[in-house]
């Protein structure tokens, strides 16, 4: 059942044969404690399918959170996507804006698929999926207003209302802990033990 629909402007560009679609996302690489831009020349399709059949077409750029995205990194991404001239410059600006939006919104993931290069070398985000960290919604009032708790796990919502952090997991094993670090370590040990 649909409870809320957000509407965005439709984009039409003539000369579709001269357009090119890319994939790009910004997310946290938890293993390395760094943000990462994942990108591919194969936009407009399911990235999991690309990863399974043609993993060599997916690239990553790790970003040190202490210094943020550097200009050379954005240029390397645009170069690896095969762009040149004005399209190259526009993609560098797009990547910088995308990363700043990711950081500024306290997102855990920003995925644009496809990123469209138009026939006149403009770069557009045609479709996006964004996950905002629930724990940052107090800082992100504009996004908090868009939140639809009917789309969330009702048990997790109820726990949050009484000041508890609750994560609903698959299976039959439960874990009650008093900190995120202990929770992660305990879950890792349970998984390791089988």
Where do the protein language model's features map onto the residues?
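ATP-dependent carboxylate/acyl-activation modules
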Residues: 1-3, 10-112, 116-194
């Amino acid at each position: 059942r649909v409870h809320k629909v957000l509407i965005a402007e439709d984009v039409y560009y003539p000369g579709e044969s001269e357009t090119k679609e890319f994939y790009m996302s910004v997310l946290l690489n938890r293993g390395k404690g760094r943000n990462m831009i994942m990108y591919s020349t194969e936009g407009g399709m399911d990235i999991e399918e690309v990863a399974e059949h043609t993993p060599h077409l997916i690239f990553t750029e790790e970003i040190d959170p202490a210094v943020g995205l550097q200009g050379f990194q954005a240029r390397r991404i645009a170069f690896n996507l095969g762009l040149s001239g004005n399209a190259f410059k526009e993609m560098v600006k797009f990547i910088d804006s995308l990363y700043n939006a990711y950081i500024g919104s306290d997102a855990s993931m920003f995925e644009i698929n496809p990123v469209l290069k138009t026939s006149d070398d403009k770069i557009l985000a045609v479709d996006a999926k964004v996950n905002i960290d629930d724990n940052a919604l107090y800082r992100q009032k504009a996004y908090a207003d868009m939140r639809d708790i009917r789309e969330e796990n009702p048990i997790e919502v109820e726990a949050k209302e009484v000041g508890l952090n609750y994560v609903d997991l698959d299976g039959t094993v439960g874990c009650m802990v008093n900190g995120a670090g202990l929770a992660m370590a305990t879950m890792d040990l349970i998984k390791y033990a089988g």
